[in-house]
Curated annotation (Swiss-Prot):
Phylogenetic lineage: Bacteria, Pseudomonadati, Pseudomonadota, Gammaproteobacteria, Oceanospirillales
PROSITE patterns in alphabetical order: ATPASE_DELTA
Subcellular localization, as worded in the UniProt entry: Cell inner membrane
Protein purpose: F(1)F(0) ATP synthase produces ATP from ADP in the presence of a proton or sodium gradient. F-type ATPases consist of two structural domains, F(1) containing the extramembraneous catalytic core and F(0) containing the membrane proton channel, linked together by a central stalk and a peripheral stalk. During catalysis, ATP synthesis in the catalytic domain of F(1) is coupled via a rotary mechanism of the central stalk subunits to proton translocation.
Protein name, UniProt field: ATP synthase subunit delta
Membrane topology of the entry: Peripheral membrane protein
GO MF annotation, one: proton-transporting ATP synthase activity, rotational mechanism
Keywords in alphabetical order: ATP synthesis, Cell inner membrane, Cell membrane, CF(1), Hydrogen ion transport, Ion transport, Membrane, Transport
Membership in a protein family: Belongs to the ATPase delta chain family.
SUPFAM superfamilies (UniProt xref): N-terminal domain of the delta subunit of the F1F0-ATP synthase
PANTHER family attached to this UniProt entry: ATP SYNTHASE DELTA CHAIN (PTHR11910)
Subunit structure and binding partners: F-type ATPases have 2 components, F(1) - the catalytic core - and F(0) - the membrane proton channel. F(1) has five subunits: alpha(3), beta(3), gamma(1), delta(1), epsilon(1). F(0) has three main subunits: a(1), b(2) and c(10-14). The alpha and beta chains form an alternating ring which encloses part of the gamma chain. F(1) is attached to F(0) by a central stalk formed by the gamma and epsilon chains, while a peripheral stalk is formed by the delta and b chains.
Matches recorded under HAMAP family: ATP_synth_delta_bact
Amino acid sequence: MAELTTIARPYAKAAFVFAKEHDALEQWEKMLGLAAAVAGDASMRAYLDQPELDDATKVSAFAEVCGDELDESGRNFVAQLTQNKRLPLLPIILQLFHELLAEQQQFTDVEMISAFELDDAATDKLVAALKKRLGTEVNVTTSVDQSLIGGVLVRAGDTVIDGSVRGRLNRLAEQLNS
């Protein structure tokens, strides 16, 4: 996954810079969201993976599915991704675009996964600690994963803070095995 993120990052940055220069960040966010959904669709992937199709046909089909939501610059972006065999990276490109957008707006998108539902006081305390550590405001998305056993797993961009019991047990097992 880290390798795919590294490959996708220049595309996300190029899209972000272009959108910012043309005052179209919101429009590009919507376009990339739709394009990522289309690229992530199993039937569309199967169609685009056909080796007998040339790049122009793939781009045309992709643009037709996206409809009017994909403007000329978006179509050119999709064409470049298709030519470089990077179209499957669109969901990662969208994620990185969101991170760049949040960074520009002085926000960091944070995913907090806990073993059990957190009450408001615990969430507020964690948000305050994250604001201090990251140095920005945070947009928090919370979810529950009981397989963590206890504790919290936090993802903020490329940073992962694993304070879960499962993570501690895994680290302990690694130490015992080495």
